[in-house]
């Protein structure tokens, strides 16, 4: 089974006040950090983005398709499923650009024992579901398009729970800083002050 790694970076970063993908984490930007993590785990990589600012990291940049543009993370995921379908990937593994500390266990558990019956897996931590950390079967592309066109509630959760989602639990890693989400300048400062060493470990 071929799996595409997709970095979700299509948001407006409104709470941060600047493009989160370009923020530095150690020696790298957050986008570069996510790319390197995926490459380390042997995944081909693309990035969902509606600006050209991420093109300097030398991976395919997938803007939201016009018919679903700015429909939230699902629009970026749909772009990834389109790309995966065209390029013969059976699955898309998504991760947000603003969560730079990802345990190796994530990649193992999310992609283990997949087959043609696997539909959608979403990660869960002690703080709850992490909908942007997910494994999507490429065959969901048409269903997702119809959902985006026809549904007012365009949340990942709404789509997932109508499509045989499996929840993959990560209960023992959150205290290590895994899945920490950078939404605000305060979050970014906390990341830099408390988890900078993680950047060195993942290099």
Regions found by a protein language model. Give the residues of each.
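Nucleotide and nucleotide-moiety/phosphate-recognizing core
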Residues: 1-153, 161-176, 185, 192-199
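PAPS-dependent sulfotransferase catalytic core
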Residues: 181
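Flexible, D/E/H-enriched segments
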Residues: 156
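Cationic, low-complexity basic patches in intrinsically disordered or flexible, solvent-exposed regions
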Residues: 202-203
């Amino acid at each position: 089974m071929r799996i595409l790694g997709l970095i979700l970076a299509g948001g407006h970063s409104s709470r941060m006040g600047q493009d989160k993908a370009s923020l530095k984490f150690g020696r790298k930007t957050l986008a570069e950090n996510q790319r390197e993590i995926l490459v380390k785990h042997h995944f081909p990589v693309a990035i969902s983005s509606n600006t050209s600012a991420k093109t300097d990291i030398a991976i395919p940049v997938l803007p939201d398709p016009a018919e679903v543009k700015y429909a939230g993370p699902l629009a970026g995921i749909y772009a990834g499923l389109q790309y995966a379908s065209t390029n013969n990937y059976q699955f898309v593994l998504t991760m947000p650009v603003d969560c730079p500390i990802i345990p190796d266990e994530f990649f193992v558990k999310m992609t283990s024992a997949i087959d043609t019956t696997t539909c959608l897996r979403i990660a869960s931590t002690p703080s709850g579901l992490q909908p942007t950390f997910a494994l999507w079967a490429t065959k969901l592309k048409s269903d997702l398009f119809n959902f985006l066109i026809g549904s007012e509630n365009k949340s990942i959760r709404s789509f997932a729970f109508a499509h045989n989602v499996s929840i993959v639990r990560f209960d023992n890693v959150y205290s290590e800083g895994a899945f920490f989400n950078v939404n605000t300048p305060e979050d970014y400062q906390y990341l830099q002050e408390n988890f900078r060493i993680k950047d060195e470990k993942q290099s």
